[in-house]
Amino acid sequence: DLHPHAIGERIGQTDYEPLAFGNGYDHNWALDKPEAGTVSLAAEAYEPATGIRMKIYADQPGLQFYAGQGMDGKEVGKRGDRHNFRSGIALETQNFPDAPNHDNFPSSVLRPGETYTQHTVYAFETDEQ
């Protein structure tokens, strides 16, 4: 079911092998692009307690979603905050993993003299309070 839902709502589903195997989300999602190479909405995250919304626009065919299950509190971030187990998420626009081994995937090969570019926009909004 790909309908919007809270991340924590399903992250512990041990009956769903991809979540159980990785102890949470670490998946690449194939985006439904209107046209290859165009910048379009890739993902949206919303925190109802703060009213903060993040929209991600990108020209990439995939989005890697990682939910921090590899964090153990040893890394320290801003203001001395520790990066603990599942204490954050990463949404990374990219090509498909293993693309060089699949002729039907967009190419990720960069040849000598070629230039690689990609465009990603992280846009933030807040609810009117």
Segments from the language model and where they lie:
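Active-site pocket scaffolds in enzymes
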Residues: D1-Q129
